[in-house]
Amino acid sequence: MPETHAILRGVRLSVDKGRLVADLIRGKKVDQALNILNFTQKKAAGIIRKVLESAIANAEHNDSADIDELKVKTIHVEQGTTLKRSAARAKGRGNRISKPTCHVYVTVGN
């Protein structure tokens, strides 16, 4: 069975926080991975759960895959563009605030 993937780009989440959750489900069966994500109390868990559900739906629709056989083959979180903002400080100065984004890649297969 071919591998199927789903990608979510530009998520307002730091890469380190996303990788923390991605490491929990790498290599697991999809039903077990969804169960882990449902009970993980992190912002990244909800985001990664949606991408995983999209990959499962892609496999079911495009490849007619059996959901019970699917496993999370690869999952990785890469750094995206950083949004740069400025914050006013005392005496007419300003500081830079960086708001990181990331890209989430999920591949499912047998």
From Swiss-Prot:
NCBIfam families: rplV_bact. HAMAP family: Ribosomal_uL22_B (MF_01331_B). This is Large ribosomal subunit protein uL22. It comes from Verminephrobacter eiseniae (strain EF01-2). InterPro entries: Ribosomal_uL22, Ribosomal_uL22_bac/chlpt-type, Ribosomal_uL22_bac/org-type, Ribosomal_uL22_CS, Ribosomal_uL22_sf. It comes from the Bacteria. GO terms for cellular component: cytosolic large ribosomal subunit. Pfam families: Ribosomal_L22. Keywords: Ribonucleoprotein, Ribosomal protein, RNA-binding, rRNA-binding.
